[in-house]
Amino acid sequence: MPKVSVIVPIYNVEKYLEKCINSLLSQTLEDIQIILVNDGSKDNSGNIAKEYEKNNKDRVIYVEKENGGLSDARNYGLKYATGDFIAFLDSDDYIEKNAYEKMYNKAIEENADYVECDFIWEFPDKIRVDKQYPYKNKKEMLSFVRVVAWNKLIKRQLIIDNNLEFPKGLRYEDVEFTYKLIPFINKFAYVDKPFIHYVQREGSIANVQNERTAEIFTVLDNVIEFYKENNIYDEYRDELEYNYARYLLCSSLKRMCKIKDKAIREKLLTESWERLNSNFPNWKENVILKTVNIGKNKYMRTVNKSTYKIYSKILEII
C-alpha cells in the first residue's frame, strides 16, 4: 500500500502541469501514488499527463473523464486512491520535495489522521508565506482553519468511514469539504514549514468573480444542515455562526464587490446581509467575534447595515 496518494485534477493547464508533476516525482517520500485526473481538458494537458504515466508506471496513474469541475475530478480520483493518506494538489501549483515525507512522518509520530502545513502565495512579482493559526482544538480549527484542500494530509479511512466528498458543481468546494471533515478528526498535527506553492494566475477560477460567487450561500447552508443531521450543531453552533458571518462580511464580500455586473453585484450584497441577519440575528454577540482580537474581528464588530453599504462601496473601487 502506498503511504500517500496525491490526487491532481487537470483542466487546461498545459503551461503549468509539468512543473506540478515534476515536483511530485521529486518527493523524498517513498511509496507515493500520483493520480492524474484529466477533467476533459481541451489543450495538450492530457497528452502531457499520459506521457508521465508511460514513463513512471510504478508511481503514476492517469485517468480521464468528461468535464465535471474540480470537485468531480477530486472525487473521481479518490476511487483510484489506495494510499494510507490522501493529499490533493492543484495542477497549476507545486510542492517542495520533502513535503510529504515531513507531513507523513509527523502523522506517524503523533498518531494523527490529519496534518497541515503552511504555504506560499506565489504572485508574478512577489511571494507571501501564509502561516496557520495555532489552534489547540477542533473548535478553534473550525473557526480559523485555512479552507484549502492542498495543504493537508488526510487519513484515507477517515474520508471513507464518513462518506465525505467534494460538492459537485459548486465553487467553494474546499469550504464544504473541510468543515464537514473537521468533526471527525481524531487527532491533528501541524508542520511549521511552507511546503506548497499556491500560484496566482489570471483567469483561474479563484480569481474570476461573477454570479457564481453566490454559491457561498448554498455551501454555508449545506454545512449547517450537515451539522444538524449529525446532531453536532449545538456543540459547534458558535463556530458555525462565526464562520457564516466571517464569510459574508469578509472574503465573500470582497468577491461580490468585484462582480462587474452592477445589478448582480447589488443583488448579492443585499442578499448576503439579509441571509446573515435572518439565520443568525444575534451574530454580533458571538463569543468568538467578541473575544478573539484579530483584524477581521475588529472590522466585523463595527459593521451595521449602514457601514456595510459604505464598506461595500469602498471595496468596489479598490
Tell what function each PLM region has.
Residues 129-131, 236, 285-286:
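Short, hydrophobic secondary-structure boundary micro-motifs
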Residues 195-201, 207-234, 250-280:
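Catalytic core of nucleotide-sugar-dependent glycosyltransferases
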Residues 233-243:
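All-alpha amphipathic helical-bundle segments outside canonical DNA-binding/catalytic cores
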Residues 259-318:
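Membrane-interface aromatic/basic loop that binds lipid-linked glycans or pyrophosphate carriers
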Residues 57, 111, 186, 231-232, ...:
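Residue-level recognition of short, structured coil/turn motifs
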Residues 244-250:
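Hydrophobic alpha-helical segments that form the core
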Residues 1-221, 225:
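Nucleotide-sugar donor-binding/catalytic module of glycosyltransferases
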